[in-house]
Amino acid sequence: MNPAVIIHSRTEEQTRAAVVSPLTMIASDGFIENGRGHPRTSGSYAKVLGKYVREEKALSLMDAIRKMTLMPAQRLEARVPSMAQKGRIKVGADADLAIFDPATVIDRSTYEDATIPSAGIPFVLVGGQVAVDSGKVTAARAGKPIRAPLGTR
């Protein structure tokens, strides 16, 4: 048995206020272990795009993308210089791209099954390698660890 404890400490109104705040960046530390995890593991970004951008119009698409890409990269790059290659689309930057349909993107993962992929995200490139192709995870071992230089922690 692999028990988990999940505590719901915020109301939906508090979550919405945090999501739309200009000071808030959106990131996730979720992971899957032994087939179990939290729904945010595969659903955080799709939930923001589907619920808060499309359905509730609480946030513009461009603001949401900035909060999920550029803001976290900028926050970390002072200590982790390689983050200056993240969260941006430009020559020389890491090619980490998610291609999604704003009309259909939505989270589908649940507390019972956090591995259910989000809908409306047909392609994902990590380091220029196709990691999701036509909505299916590929066998590519794309990406690389991001580490702070020694002595900066």
Regions found by a protein language model. Name each.
Residues M1-K57:
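Active-site neighborhoods of metal-dependent hydrolases
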Residues K67-M71, D96, L125-G127:
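Mid-to-C-terminal alpha-helical segments outside catalytic/metal-binding sites
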